[in-house]
Amino acid sequence: MQEKLNKQDSNTETTTEKTEDTSAESEVVSEAVTDAAPSENEPASDGANILVAYFSRADENYNVGTIDKGNTQIVAEYIASEVGADSFHIETVTPYPAGYDECCDVAKQEQADKARPEIQGGVENMEQYDIVFLGYPIWWGDMPMAVYTFMDSYDFSDKVVIPFNTHEGSGESGTYSAITSYLPDAQVLDGMAIQGKTAQEFSSDTQQAVRDWLDGLGF
C-alpha cells in the first residue's frame, strides 16, 4: 500500500499511498524530520523505561513483493535492540487481506470512515514507560487507522513520543505533526522516515541509519 498508499494525488494534494509506499531509489537512506519536534531533543534515556510500539504488515507489499516480516517491524526491531526497549506489535483483531490491492481498498475505506479498528491485546503497565517509539507505514498519506486506535487507548501525558515510519516515496507525509496535535500532552521528538525497500534489502544501511538517528536524539 505503500505506492497507492504513497502516491501524490495531483488533484487533491493528498498523498495517496496504498499499503507499505513508493519511491525511486535514493541515496538518502533516512531522514530526520524536525518540524514537529521541540528544539531540545534530550530524552534522558539513562534509566528510562522505553517501549517500541509499531504497526507493520507482511504479505504482499508494494515494491518488495510478498514478505514474511513487515518493513516497519524490521526497523522497530533494530530500534528496540539499540535502546534496550520492550516491544508491542499493534495488530488488528480482523486481519488485513494478504493481497496488496485488496488491503489498499480496506485501508482506504477505513480512512474515509475515520475508523478505529479493534486491536489485539494491549500494553501491560503502560504507565511505567517514559519513552514510546511509535512506528508505522504510510497508508494513503496517513498512519494506518489502527495506530489511532493505539493512541486513543492510553494516556500519553508527560511521555516522550518518538515517531518513525517506512514509506516508498512520501516520507513522513505530515504524520509527525499529526501526532504532535493528537497527543498534545506528550513531548514529540524528531522522527525518522526510511524507505521500506531499504529496510527489506539493505540491512546494514538501515541499521546505520537507525544508529545515527538515535545518536542525534541523545541515546
For each feature predicted by the language model, list its residue ranges.
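N-terminal beta1-alpha1-beta2 submodule of the flavodoxin-like/Rossmannoid cofactor-binding fold
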Residues: Q2-K7, E13-Y129, G141, R211, ...
